[in-house]
Amino acid sequence: PRGAGRVNAPTITTAFTECVGGEDPSVQTGMGWVSGPELTAATANAGGLGIIASATMTYAELENAIVRTKELTTRPFGVNLRADAEDAAERCELMIRHGVRVASFALAPKPELIARLKENGLVVVPSIGAAKHAVKVASWGADAVIVQGGEGGGHTGPVATTLLLPSVIDALGGAGNTSIPVIAGGGFFDGRGLVAALAYGAAGVAMGTRFLLTSDSRVPDAVKQQYLEKGLQDTVVSTRVDGMPHRVLRTGLVNALESGSPVKGMLAAVQNANKFKSMTGMRWQALARDGLNMKKASDRTWQQIVMAANTP
């Protein structure tokens, strides 16, 4: 959907739509290089929650993206942040200043950051991959959580959505009684999935690839066509892309990474880190500090930290 007008569609009210102020319990996830102002605003105008991906943006680019999104929609939208980024606090202040409705996090933000956002009216929604993490962020004050199962694209875990989702819902109080809304992610792409998620006790669904393929996505049509031509057996979970389990399309590049040596993978990571540095305006010192923060916040090896440059 395009333009600033609301698209006529049935309203589905859940605890999550009441929390963020939308009409449709669908979340367009913050995908690096994909989720820009146009896609985010189009999702918001259709009644869902659109989320800007900020990890691949400089501070100034993020501010421009927020301003542009506000020009395209008057409806609530969000920004996805890396909780371990060096300037996470400054980016949160930017969101507060511009009246962004939702702060989405790929990793759990610190309790004091959650408190700062909430006291300024933002809804805090971390993504989690285990029931114990959902309980932890709920105790810290998170307003909702996104749960992504193993079917999801991008960074993913080993547990299927059909197993992970009910475990999280049960840990938070059970279907119809969760302490905070739970959004289901991983393998959802249409109304049937939404109905299934609601039946499990979720308050909505989060989708990435489905929104990547829309007309408002900035992804080139040639790339979209590759997605459309692939079948169920054409994705692979690889640790060779960036050192962490990552569901990607099986392409020539991925096959080369899978069959290549670890040394070549590390070399590619350094080269991609240099490209990422140029595209974001970050300095090597800032990249190194982010790497240290990532190491402290996770159990990744140093090889995985360096390899993470393959997919910012």
Where is each model-derived feature located?
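Short, structured patches in soluble enzyme cores that scaffold and shape functional sites
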Residues: L107, G149, A184-G186, T209
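Conserved active-site-proximal phosphate/metal-binding subdomains
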Residues: V7, P158-P181, F189-P312
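Residue-level detector of alpha-helix initiation sites
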Residues: V34, G187-F189
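Conserved acidic functional residues
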Residues: S127, G186-G187
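Active-site entrance/lid segments in N-terminal catalytic domains of soluble metabolic enzymes
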Residues: P1-S179
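Thr-Gly-centered strand-to-loop micro-motif
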Residues: T29-G30, I52-A53, A184-G185, M207, ...
